[in-house]
């Protein structure tokens, strides 16, 4: 898929992603991991699922809830839910996505 195929996201140069087309723009920063809150868990960084808007913690966090969510639901792409970060990651294609200009 060409890097310009996604209206909201472009695939980083040299990468291929079959999931970028039609993804919504990231909806901004989040405050907490929805999965850590009920168990009193700690998180390092937050990721937002672009399929269902679920907010979960990154792989540097003890519980790695974003990856667990992607695996359990087959939702392929998460975006950073951190302030001043504008990128997304496609799990199946291991591709970095950046906002389209």
Question: Where in the sequence are the language-model features?
Answer:
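Extended, low-complexity, charged intrinsically disordered regions
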Residues: 1-7
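Cys/His-rich, Zn2+-coordinating zinc-finger modules
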Residues: 8-9, 13-21, 27-34, 39, ...
